A protein has these predicted regions:
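Divalent metal-cofactor coordination and adjacent catalytic microenvironments
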Residues: 1-149
Length: 149
């Protein structure tokens, strides 16, 4: 079983909210808190589907069946914070998107950092997805939008 949990995430840039509102044709500021929540959900959904970071996050990855003592990390990894087995820190090497250890780790905590090219590519999909959420589109439409990632 693999379990990926967001421990901490950066806020979406304020400019993204204004760009989303322009994309969706929303002129007033009365719903900004709702729109910000929708935008945050869209950002997290798109970055999960694309497996690339749009905002900096700290993740905790739990994996109970590691093959070959290598754990694949998700999204745009910038730093491994800790690797633990049965609650104790273990030595590891970090190569590419994988953490290699002498024996199976249970938990890897790591940070991600977005890349400008990923933001440029994925932000239009975020706005499209957020607009669909705002408009109450069905799950089939939402899945179709995410398939563009």
């Amino acid at each position: 079983m693999i379990e990926l949990t967001i421990i901490e995430k950066a806020d979406t840039p304020a400019a993204w909210l204004e760009q989303f509102k322009a994309y969706a044709g929303i002129a007033d500021n009365a719903q900004d808190s709702l729109l910000q929540a929708i935008l945050s959900k869209a950002v997290l959904s798109v970055q999960q589907k694309a497996d690339r970071s749009l905002i900096a996050c700290t993740f905790e990855l739990y994996e109970d069946e590691v093959e070959g003592n290598a754990v694949r990390l998700y999204q745009s990894v910038s730093q491994v914070v800790s690797v633990k087995h049965e609650g104790n820190g273990v030595a590891y090497s970090f190569i590419g998107r994988k953490v290699h250890v002498a024996h199976s780790p249970e938990t890897v905590t790591y940070k991600t950092e977005p890349h400008l090219a990923d933001i440029d590519t994925l932000l239009p999909i975020v706005y499209q997805y957020a607009t669909a959420l705002y408009d109450g589109e069905d799950s089939k439409t939402l899945a179709s939008i995410l398939s563009q990632c």
